[in-house]
């Protein structure tokens, strides 16, 4: 590809400017000659490290306004700035596997430089219509509620929506555990504006799981995941670009090696939030709820690159923070339009102690179609949702009049729905250290078989507690037996 450059190609040209103003992460630079292009990377020496600036605006004939990719502490007016003549270029390829990179592609895992001659720009065009390929193969996650009610597609875009503390990151980590370990290809994880502690935990968990392999000599050969971090403490410039850096890494494996890539993003809302901060600093007039006026454009530019082509695929799982649990907020609303499957986490379900706290009636998937999942799966999923919806409709009557006022049929439906609700819970491998309960991975066949029997009323005689935090129906039966003996 013409844009795959070696470090020596397109070396820094001689266009030199000087810093005229520093306002937090926004830096104004004056040039005497030609101005650098928009999105060009500029280098400025700040103490003992090179600070990367990205050109965002031209202000007047001689000045450009830039966004800093790292802290500007210590930067003074008059400092010399060099135009690199190209965008921010990041190393790509097998050498990035097992490593942690920052937004500009520098290693931050203290394991020495990345020995890759291949580099990609972080801003790249989306694949054309001719290059794209439709996906219709189901990606089995081993999580019952997901596989049954909002199944994921290989090569699809998946969103995990939820407010603060309802379990988005835990589900992402469980998906990495269940899918990435069994996945033949490579994975890329972009940590966008989230907690540094979580990034640290994930790195060591991946080593324990064997997805990242570090030899005694420090080599990471045999690793299957690359990590790109721009965490909460980073300036908004880094947080608004780190998802693009991760995506460039994933695109290399898709386009150049023809691989099926898993791309995890935690959290896509922070990408929007950082864009909002940058927009305000650049003096743009804000739009609804204070977000940037270019919200839909920026989201589209990112999401349209995440797609399957005839060469390979990118399956993306994106956590989406929902401010104040309001799904109509412009940031989550802008993300909805791009997704193939949405898994919505509900605080009221989490408060009942049912984890994963997935809302079975709010979560949707384009692939819950008899042509894709098959007639049996489709019918079982719809019957489960119908039972839960009927129960939801009866809850007001139960709250006012009590269970005794219901008809016998309604009482059966309520009992069945409560069993289904509890059966949708599942112990996770990544939560094992906190709960002490071993994680369960349930096959799609077992999930369909189990729910088909429960929704048909075959297990109405078992106590509700037997369905809580188990794998398939056989475990629920065994738990019921144990409860009977202990009673």
From Swiss-Prot:
InterPro entries: AAA+_ATPase, ATP-synt_VA_C, ATP_synth_F1_bsu, ATPase_a/bsu_AS, ATPase_alpha/beta_chains, ATPase_F1/V1/A1_a/bsu_N, ATPase_F1/V1/A1_a/bsu_N_sf, ATPase_F1/V1/A1_a/bsu_nucl-bd. CDD domains: ATP-synt_F1_beta_C (cd18110), ATP-synt_F1_beta_N (cd18115), F1-ATPase_beta_CD (cd01133). SMART domains: AAA. ATP binds at residues 162-169. Keywords: ATP synthesis, ATP-binding, Cell inner membrane, Cell membrane, CF(1), Hydrogen ion transport, Ion transport, Membrane, Nucleotide-binding, Translocase, Transport. Gene3D superfamilies: 2.40.10.170, Bovine Mitochondrial F1-atpase, Atp Synthase Beta Chain, Chain D, domain 3, P-loop containing nucleotide triphosphate hydrolases. One of its GO terms (cellular component) is proton-transporting ATP synthase complex. The keyword S-adenosyl-L-methionine does not apply. The keyword Transport applies. It is found in: Cell inner membrane. Pfam families: ATP-synt_ab, ATP-synt_ab_N, ATP-synt_VA_C. Its EC number is 7.1.2.2. It catalyses: ATP + H2O + 4 H(+)(in) = ADP + phosphate + 5 H(+)(out). Produces ATP from ADP in the presence of a proton gradient across the membrane. The catalytic sites are hosted primarily by the beta subunits. Belongs to the ATPase alpha/beta chains family. F-type ATPases have 2 components, CF(1) - the catalytic core - and CF(0) - the membrane proton channel. CF(1) has five subunits: alpha(3), beta(3), gamma(1), delta(1), epsilon(1). CF(0) has three main subunits: a(1), b(2) and c(9-12). The alpha and beta chains form an alternating ring which encloses part of the gamma chain. CF(1) is attached to CF(0) by a central stalk formed by the gamma and epsilon chains, while a peripheral stalk is formed by the delta and b chains. HAMAP family: ATP_synth_beta_bact. This is ATP synthase subunit beta 1. It comes from Gluconobacter oxydans (strain 621H).
